[in-house]
Regions:
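Conserved N-terminal catalytic/coupling substructures associated with nucleotide/phosphate chemistry
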Residues: 1-138
Length: 138
């Protein structure tokens, strides 16, 4: 769900980059490359392609509306990069041309990105955000 919320927040904001396999070490004030190798071993066929397919099916298809899933290449690009001899999943997210709600436990959730945080907004703040970003209540 955390990955889905981050992707939704980027879609509803100005886009952005999500790195899976990078961990923030708050005590040291830096990021640590941990890689996704263990997650890849748990994926369908234990390959990067299987990991990518798992991300798409279990996150994008599950939590996002068909307009995102059916036109994934318009909004999301998934690549794998080798950093410090570990594999990192790099998800590049473009800003959506209309609002995107996540469906979690039969509730519609609207996320935005503020600085380095994902935030849920609702009510009047949601309406104001939609008008600001897309010019209407689209």
């Amino acid at each position: 769900v955390i990955i889905a919320k981050s992707i939704a927040a980027f879609l509803n904001s100005d886009g952005g980059n999500l790195l899976i396999g990078v961990k923030e070490n708050k005590e040291k004030g830096k990021f640590e490359i941990v890689g996704i190798e263990e997650d890849v071993k748990k994926s369908r066929d234990h390959t990067l392609d299987g990991y990518k397919r798992t991300l798409i099916d279990e996150i994008i298809r599950t939590f996002f509306p068909p307009k995102i899933y059916n036109h994934l290449h318009n909004y999301i690009e998934i690549e794998f990069v080798d950093i410090e001899e570990k594999i990192v999943c790099w998800i590049k997210v473009k800003r959506s041309d209309s609002r995107v709600f996540l469906k979690i436990n039969d509730r519609d959730i609207f996320m935005i990105r503020v600085d380095s945080e994902n935030r849920t907004i609702e009510g009047e703040k949601l309406v104001d955000n939609c008008i600001k970003k897309w010019g209407s209540r689209s």
